[in-house]
């Protein structure tokens, strides 16, 4: 279950155009994954999933969910969260964090991660740390 959550985390946090090569880091500066040409890799370089037209799949092709504008849905079509500007909320409207100047902050303002070369459409790491209850 934790592996599935980790894969889902990587799939959802790195949503952007295929032209970008992106890297995501945890609060300690360790790389947790990268996105390249529509494919997502974990920290060891293993392929874990892909993004096609706003839809997210794991490495086996299993559909995990999608984005539609600033809203994010799980595979059943249930809204799981949304963003407004640089602030992220769960499906109930509870504030869970923000993204600013390449850094990701939790709801208390504590920096929990960072990213590089990520365009503005990226889904915040903080949103997924909260959603998937990862440390």
What does each model-found stretch correspond to?
Residues 2-6, 17-38, 43-46, 53, ...:
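Long terminal segments
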